[in-house]
């Protein structure tokens, strides 16, 4: 198994179950190429919800004067591909994602959709490994 200590340091979280982190970093192109039968898409699904919840909870507590509609708009601006892509770049997530050869050759490690999806998957992995 790959040593993810550098990524864990950037995340500020050490995984008890390293397989969860490995799965979060497994792009479908890599899974298909290596016939693994598993990739990060299901974790991405959960990560999106976890990020939405945590952001909503934070905004609810910090922006007590804003009505629901404004909170929703603000959450949407914070939890979007552009923001998640930026967070993924801050921790150099692209250098840890396992991509298939074709995806790698076409710049997948720097593609906003790939990085933002992997970031959501990593958030879900943290959630399942240690809770919120």
List each language-model region with its residue ranges:
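RNase III-family endoribonuclease catalytic core
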Residues: 1-132
